[in-house]
């Protein structure tokens, strides 16, 4: 008797669109060559009771009868993180924290767990990438830890769900979502269907049991969280932890927040004993700035509700090639090309035979249009070899 063919479907890696056959372009997000083939998950009776435990009879409620007086935010005791979250953690929220491997995501969340446990909160840290011994070693490096932090090294989401319902913690950390799986979903951990199923279950746990869940997600080479784009749509808040691998500064940026602004940014410094908050980023950004040096300008950018001073560096030199080079770090490349074209058109600065290198010192990435004036002055300063007064601050579009 011939074996029955295993049924498969195709998922879009970007948005999670499902199709019975392979498509060159996704009808949902219009991405090309984004479909992957995965087996269809079979329904298994009597799966984890967590979903049913969080499922309650839905009853329509008048909006006027809904009260929010008891929805107090929980402070992480990390002021820079509270700033990005909009004032603290919202109970029952689902937060996605993305970033490059080794950037410090786990360190940041482990420090948050320590602060929450010191305030009497029950915390469950679920790790699918490290052993108990490794987590203990990292915790000892960060300092004194409370005994109230529970650690679970597991990747089976059904076991994790049961542990959450038994313990009923205030905050859960999932590190990372790409390692979680369910046995009844017939695909490898990190696949589109596994990530989508895991996020769906965690969302129901967060909303049904009023437990705040932090999800750690790795990013792709394009700088977005690996997995289906629907992952970012399902969560309440999306935070990106960024930074230059060669610099000590780290930046926590919100790209989605249902409970606050997405314009805020948190600044940290990576040290041997963990992350340290930078309450005055301008002071740190201008450390080591050379005085009376051509091509170096202090510019001002508004990040959220506070101004930040940064050093804009430019190097303009004669090119040895037919096509001059244009590079930028920390700011938009196309914006730099636009400004160079405006300078050539309006003030007659001919850079057709010159290479131009633009850099925002400190590893910070700024898309603020007010940085335009700093870029223009830095390029002029380098081209004319004239230093700008170190006490001069420029900003303007």
What kind of region is each of these model predictions?
Residues 130-131:
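Conserved Rossmann-like nucleotide-cofactor binding loop
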Residues 3-14, 18-83, 90-98, 103-114, ...:
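Peripheral, non-AAA+ core regions of ATP-driven protein-machinery
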